[in-house]
């Protein structure tokens, strides 16, 4: 009689343990699939906070993207025919179409397609435009967790901190010395041209 009970209990225990293992594995895979890349990077034990931001292949050299840079302050970055850098709220303005060219890994040069001027920043953090591309025209492009991009001068810093391309609430460029990565004035969406 005991053998008969064991043969019925043993398969039940096996089925239950298999069921629990399947549920456990399913829960883990569902939890991993629901994670953002930043959360998964945290679980992999990345120590640097810079590693938690996304990176794309186009940042590795030679790529050219044509985009409108839309600031979180509701202005498009614009370089006009005289080389003046400012914001515009006109989406269809031809001077707000930018060519974002990868110079090195994570480093880009931004050029107005219509004006043919490059965006540049001097050591005081003032944004201006140049016909010829040089080190002042190189910016570190960083994609933030909120899906916005920041552009910090690759050459210049202020008191050890980065200086960012930024447009204030009136569309006027903010000096790099007064900017921080967290400020919405420095957050841009590279919008595809439609």
Curated annotation (Swiss-Prot):
Assembly and partners are described as: Interacts with FGFBP1. Interacts with FGFR2. Affinity between fibroblast growth factors (FGFs) and their receptors is increased by heparan sulfate glycosaminoglycans that function as coreceptors.
A single Pfam family, by name? FGF
Listed under GO biological process in this entry are: positive regulation of cell division
Q: Does the keyword Signal apply?
A: yes
Main location as per UniProt: secreted
Family according to the record:
Belongs to the heparin-binding growth factors family.
Protein name, please? Fibroblast growth factor 7
Q: Which domain of life is it from?
A: Eukaryota
What keywords were assigned to this record? Glycoprotein, Growth factor, Heparin-binding, Mitogen, Secreted, Signal
Looking up InterPro entries in the UniProt record yields:
Fibroblast_GF_fam, IL1/FGF
Q: What does this protein do?
A: Plays an important role in the regulation of embryonic development, cell proliferation and cell differentiation. Required for normal branching morphogenesis. Growth factor active on keratinocytes. Possible major paracrine effector of normal epithelial cell proliferation.
Provide the glycosylation site positions: 45
A GO molecular-function annotation:
heparin binding
């Amino acid at each position: 009689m005991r053998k008969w009970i064991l043969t019925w209990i043993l398969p039940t225990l096996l089925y239950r343990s298999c069921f629990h293992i399947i549920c456990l594995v399913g829960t883990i895979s569902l939890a991993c699939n629901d994670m953002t890349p930043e959360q998964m990077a945290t679980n992999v034990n990345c120590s640097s906070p810079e590693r938690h931001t996304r990176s794309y292949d186009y940042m590795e050299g030679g790529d050219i993207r044509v985009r409108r840079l839309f600031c979180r302050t509701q202005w498009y970055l614009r370089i006009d025919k005289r080389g003046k850098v400012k914001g515009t709220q006109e989406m269809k303005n031809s001077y707000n179409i930018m060519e974002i060219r990868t110079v090195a890994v994570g480093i880009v040069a931004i050029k107005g397609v219509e004006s043919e001027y490059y965006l540049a920043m001097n050591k005081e953090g003032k944004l201006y435009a140049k016909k010829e591309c040089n080190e002042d025209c190189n910016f570190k492009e960083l994609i933030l967790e909120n899906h916005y991009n920041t552009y910090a001068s690759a050459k210049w810093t202020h008191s050890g901190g980065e200086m960012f391309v930024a447009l204030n609430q009136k569309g006027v460029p903010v000096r790099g010395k007064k900017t921080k990565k967290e400020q919405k004035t420095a957050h841009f969406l590279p919008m595809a041209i439609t």
